[in-house]
Amino acid sequence: MAIRKYKPTTPGRRASSVSEFSEITRSTPEKSLLRPLSKTGGRNVHGHITTRHKGGGHKRRYRVIDFRRNDKDGVVAKVAHIEYDPNRTANIALLHYRDGEKRYIIAPRGLKQGALVESGPNADIKVGNNLPLRNIPAGTTIHCVELKPGGGAKMARSAGASIQLLGKEGKYAVLRMPSSEIRRVDIRCRATVGEVGNQEQINIRWGKAGRMRWKGWRPTVRGAAMNPVDHPHGGGEGRTSGGRHPVSPWGQLEGRTRRPNRPSDKMIVRRRRPNKKR
């Protein structure tokens, strides 16, 4: 994927860039794999804001992605198209299986239109093929990795993401995550060979607030710029330090967003930042 920079014809375009979409081969999605997608504006069923900075944005339709690929073992599929997906940073690939079925998958880096892919324990180790971890050699770069056998891909699904299979220990595979965390996963879990494509997406400069609003992102306002009724840091005559440690609008200390004592924590061999206090 290439990035095209705009000429500074306006203040909004001066610092902005856009993807050239050179890998995209079709602009119209497969109608049978579309589902309606309603907007929540970050609210729950009671109308209370549960996720800040969300709302508005262009209307979208959800593309149904096959994250399991376990019911098509041994059936060869041809990559019909590489398409854009507004619901994720990665591109998606439309597969035409030999039995006539069509499905979307996350498009790996280097997967081209017309390529053949396959899933199952006997599939070759090549980009786009989906296999159980026990059948993938150590040192292989993988993505779309399951956490539980048959649960569907949960890890390394965004643009440019990849996981390295370090080795196998009994009934577990040892993985190096994109965050440098090392964790164990059941060796029966599936993964797709290669890394997720569209890796240049991180280099796009949005240039103006309006482009973020098109994506459904609302402004992030500092607590110190609010009134006391809206935030613990709000109010004061002029600019003040707040006199306390940074907190959320509900008074919770900033940082430490990972929930401690998760059942899956016992599978972590080395944390992302081993020297940081938990």
UniProtKB/Swiss-Prot annotation:
<dbReference type="InterPro" id="IPR014726">
    <property type="entry name" value="Ribosomal_uL2_dom3"/>
</dbReference>
<dbReference type="InterPro" id="IPR022666">
    <property type="entry name" value="Ribosomal_uL2_RNA-bd_dom"/>
</dbReference>
<comment type="subunit">
    <text>Part of the 50S ribosomal subunit. Forms a bridge to the 30S subunit in the 70S ribosome.</text>
</comment>
<feature type="region of interest" description="Disordered">
    <location>
        <begin position="222"/>
        <end position="278"/>
    </location>
</feature>
<feature type="compositionally biased region" description="Polar residues">
    <location>
        <begin position="16"/>
        <end position="27"/>
    </location>
</feature>
<feature type="region of interest" description="Disordered">
    <location>
        <begin position="1"/>
        <end position="59"/>
    </location>
</feature>
<keyword id="KW-0689">Ribosomal protein</keyword>
<comment type="function">
    <text>One of the primary rRNA binding proteins. Required for association of the 30S and 50S subunits to form the 70S ribosome, for tRNA binding and peptide bond formation. It has been suggested to have peptidyltransferase activity; this is somewhat controversial. Makes several contacts with the 16S rRNA in the 70S ribosome.</text>
</comment>
<dbReference type="InterPro" id="IPR008991">
    <property type="entry name" value="Translation_prot_SH3-like_sf"/>
</dbReference>
<dbReference type="InterPro" id="IPR005880">
    <property type="entry name" value="Ribosomal_uL2_bac/org-type"/>
</dbReference>
<feature type="compositionally biased region" description="Basic residues">
    <location>
        <begin position="45"/>
        <end position="59"/>
    </location>
</feature>
<keyword id="KW-0687">Ribonucleoprotein</keyword>
<keyword id="KW-0694">RNA-binding</keyword>
<dbReference type="InterPro" id="IPR012340">
    <property type="entry name" value="NA-bd_OB-fold"/>
</dbReference>
<dbReference type="InterPro" id="IPR002171">
    <property type="entry name" value="Ribosomal_uL2"/>
</dbReference>
<keyword id="KW-0699">rRNA-binding</keyword>
<dbReference type="GO" id="GO:0016740">
    <property type="term" value="F:transferase activity"/>
</dbReference>
<dbReference type="Pfam" id="PF00181">
    <property type="entry name" value="Ribosomal_L2"/>
</dbReference>
<dbReference type="InterPro" id="IPR022669">
    <property type="entry name" value="Ribosomal_uL2_C"/>
</dbReference>
<dbReference type="GO" id="GO:0015934">
    <property type="term" value="C:large ribosomal subunit"/>
</dbReference>
<dbReference type="InterPro" id="IPR022671">
    <property type="entry name" value="Ribosomal_uL2_CS"/>
</dbReference>
<dbReference type="GO" id="GO:0002181">
    <property type="term" value="P:cytoplasmic translation"/>
</dbReference>
<dbReference type="Pfam" id="PF03947">
    <property type="entry name" value="Ribosomal_L2_C"/>
</dbReference>
<dbReference type="GO" id="GO:0003735">
    <property type="term" value="F:structural constituent of ribosome"/>
</dbReference>
<dbReference type="InterPro" id="IPR014722">
    <property type="entry name" value="Rib_uL2_dom2"/>
</dbReference>
<protein>
    <recommendedName>
        <fullName>Large ribosomal subunit protein uL2</fullName>
    </recommendedName>
</protein>
<dbReference type="GO" id="GO:0019843">
    <property type="term" value="F:rRNA binding"/>
</dbReference>
<comment type="similarity">
    <text>Belongs to the universal ribosomal protein uL2 family.</text>
</comment>
<feature type="compositionally biased region" description="Basic residues">
    <location>
        <begin position="269"/>
        <end position="278"/>
    </location>
</feature>
